[in-house]
Structures are given as C-alpha cells and as structure tokens.
Amino acid sequence: MTLNDLSNFLQRNRKKILLATLIIFTGGGLLLFWQSSQKNKEPGPADDEGEIPTFSFAGDTWKISGQLNLGKLAETSLPQETVVYKVSEQKESITEPQAQDIAERFDFDREPTNRVFLPDGEKMFVFAQDEVNMAVFSYPREIRYSFKNVVAKTKNVSGKIYNQSTAIQKAREYLESKNLPTANIVFFDTRYLIYDVEAVAQTQNPKSANALELSFVRAIVGQNILGKTISEPLVRVVFNRTGTVVSLSYKETDQTFTQFKIISLLSFTEATASLKENGLVISMLPTEAAKERFIEADDLTSFTPQTISLVYYQVPGTEFLIPIYLSEGKGTLDAGEVYANVALSAIKP
C-alpha cells in the first residue's frame, strides 16, 4: 500500500484509520489479533438524564463459551465501593508546525511525506525515511512511530531483553529525550513478545522473546484508566533485544474528572461467579506454543485467569468513567492456546 493509497483509504474510512496505519508500520504482522481492537463499534448506551451507562467495549469482543478454571487465581482483596466519574475533555489539536517539530525530534525531515485530510477538518501528517515511518494525528492527538519491518528488526537481532525495571526506566528516558511528557502517566503492564513472519505471540519466558512491550496509562486515585481497548493504552513502547525502540504509540489527553456517584462493587466471589456469563474477552495473543499456527479470534473454549484487578474505563459514546474488573490469564480456542484479557463490569446490580 502506497502513501497515496493510504490517503484515499483514510478519507473513505476514518473508523479504520489506526488499522491502516498499523498496516504501514508493521507490514500486517500485528493484525491477526489486534485488528478487532482497532474497530470502533457504535457508541454505548448513555442515559439522557445522566445515569451510569451499561458497560460496553469498543472493538470486537468474545465470550467464555467453555470451562472457567479458577485454580490459579488467588483470592484478591477488592474495595467494597468506589466512585463513578464524569469526564470533561478540552479539545486541542496538533498543528502542522507542531507536527514538524515532533518529526525533527525523531530525526525526520520537517516536510511531511504526505498529508491526509480527515473528517471534521482534522489531518494526519506522515513522515517517512528509509527504515522508519511516523504518523502524527492532529486530533485526537497521537504519535505513531515504527520501523517499516518490525519483524526483521526484532527477529533478526541478538542481545538480551531488558528486565522490567530497566525497561521502565529506559522507556521514560526515551520519551523524555523526544520531549514527550511523562509526568501524568503510570506504568501499567509488560508483555514479552515473539515477532514472527506470520503473527505476534506472547510468552512468559524472557529468553524466548525477541521484543518487550511496555504500556503506560493515566490513573485516578491509584486506579489505572484503560484506553478504548486493552491493546491501545495511552503510551506503548516496544524494545527489541538491543534496546532499540522499534515501535511507539503516544497519545495526549486533556481530560479532567469530577465525582458523579459512589457505587458498590462486586466482591471477589461475586466477580468470579459472574465472569463466565458476563465477562467480555477483549484481547488475545497466541502463546509461544501456538505461534506457528494461524489462530482466528473466537469465543474461548476455556479460560484460566491468573490475576484480577480493578481499573477504570470510559464507556464509548458517553462521558462516564466506570470501574471494571480486568482478568488476565490463559485461554484456549479450537486452534490453540492464547493469553487473554477478560473485562467485567465491577458495579454491583
């Protein structure tokens, strides 16, 4: 796909803009399990009188159709109540001169390779060099930087993957070197990845990994705030074995939060009892054992959660930030084993 092709595509279909960008950046390697998280569904239900909306999730979701195994999930202390927040956002856009300044910080020429005109008067500024591409979105403000062939830049290099503490420090240093603010973000998660020609797999063995992904989010009263999807946090940095940043996504937000209502939460026992019936599988990646197979996302035939945590999430199409439980663990499909994330509304009926 050429940049002109991309321009035409984006003008026709704004909802798939991040997917199209991802195609340019990675050659499609991440699409197998991430493309569904890039699609935006219709806005979730929101009450005209300001009532708390029903939990829904952006992008495709799946269910746990088979067995739920709780043997590896330790009982977790969860709060009995929390606050639902209303979100206010002041719209700020990145201008072309600002996009050019950002490009210079990443050692690109100031002149964009292409300008893509988006609906509502917004733009995407594309910068390209021999090995790397970058897209700067005017609004919502976002930077996406990546090597054109991430697989080659990870699979064909040698070295030792950073440990988590070193990686967090290096990620912050990298962002600060590009003059990207880090004061309002907190570390969220680490994933050891195996980039291969066919797909991206996840592993718990750092020695098997050829890339390390770190994600950062905003937090409120100590609780993390997810983005619209679990695979699209506020900041995502991917290192290869040599410590080179091979992929970066960085979003800026101008949100403020005001307390709306104190609500009661499901207990640990109530949450686990409800997980199979009401949980939504929101992301999955093949395990190392399944990385050679073509796995199409589908309902899980089994799920073994290993952790459960309370996080916040803004329901699509609403101004409400609500609490949800996020469970992480291993699941199975007919085609193989995956690492999966399952979201469940934390609000007690």
Kindly give the residue locations of the regions a language model identified.
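Preferential activation on post-signal-peptide N-terminal prodomains/segments
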Residues: M1-F216, I220-G227, K251-F260
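Short, low-complexity, Pro/Ser/Thr/Gly-rich segments in the mature regions of secreted, periplasmic
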Residues: G331, G336-P349
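Segments that shape or occlude catalytic/ligand-binding pockets
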Residues: T154-N163, A167-Y325, G329, L333-G336
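Short, solvent-exposed coil/turn segments at beta-strand boundaries
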Residues: D130-S146, F239-T244, L321-I322, K348-P349
